[in-house]
């Protein structure tokens, strides 16, 4: 199997808007404080982000976090399955559950790590994301809201994938922990944009390729 895939170095990004799929599914404090308890996944995305910014791209980052219920009906169904009384389930509680999975804390931490502003969109492909993506300039970075807030994300809905792709000119896949999922933001968008991998995926593929082609011995293979 060929593990040499095209990366961001193989495509021109200067002056272009780049949709970057990251894996910002980071653990949060369980007290609802919005504190990130481990930021290594954010740090893992920095080399690709910094490369794009240094090469004058306008970066539109996106990621999922957790397993939110994108509609109130889905929320009620899920909570009912857990044994909750439907009469106690309100839209206010549903919206609170969404707020707890917002990427706003990620934007704040990413801003600290980059030493520059990270613009936060209030939605994924809605009016706010569209307006901010359209206004984004080279050297700036925009973070879309949790992709799983869109009900079409986990279904790889072509309409959602096309809407996300319309925000940019190039797609960079760098969410190694999520690339096995055929979702709109990980698979579908690649049908509408030139697509390459980021440095995190490149690194992981090199490790996998080396382990298969020339493994260090003795070795133990664990399959699950």
What are the residue ranges of the model-derived segments?
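Active-site loop-to-helix "anion-binding N-cap" substructures in soluble metabolic enzymes
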Residues: 1-224
């Amino acid at each position: 199997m060929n593990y040499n895939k095209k990366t961001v170095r193989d495509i021109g990004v200067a002056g272009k808007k780049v949709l970057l799929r990251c894996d910002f599914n980071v653990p949060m404090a369980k007290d609802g404080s919005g504190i990130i308890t481990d930021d290594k996944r954010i740090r893992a995305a920095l080399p690709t982000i910094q490369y794009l910014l240094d090469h004058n791209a306008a970066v539109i980052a996106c990621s999922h976090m957790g397993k939110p219920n994108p509609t109130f009906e889905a929320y009620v169904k899920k909570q009912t399955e857990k044994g909750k009384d439907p009469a106690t389930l309100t839209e206010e509680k549903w919206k609170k559950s969404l707020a707890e999975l917002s990427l706003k804390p990620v934007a704040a931490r990413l801003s600290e790590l980059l030493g520059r502003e990270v613009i936060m969109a209030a939605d994924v492909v809605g009016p706010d994301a569209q307006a901010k993506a359209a206004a984004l300039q080279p050297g700036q970075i925009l973070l879309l809201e949790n992709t799983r807030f869109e009900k079409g994300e986990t279904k790889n809905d072509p309409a959602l994938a096309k809407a996300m792709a319309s925000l940019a000119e190039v797609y960079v896949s760098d969410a190694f922990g999520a690339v096995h999922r055929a979702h709109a933001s990980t698979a579908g968008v690649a049908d509408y944009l030139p697509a390459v991998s980021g440095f995190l995926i490149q690194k992981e593929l090199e490790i996998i390729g080396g382990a298969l082609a020339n493994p260090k011995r003795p070795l133990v293979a664990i399959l699950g």
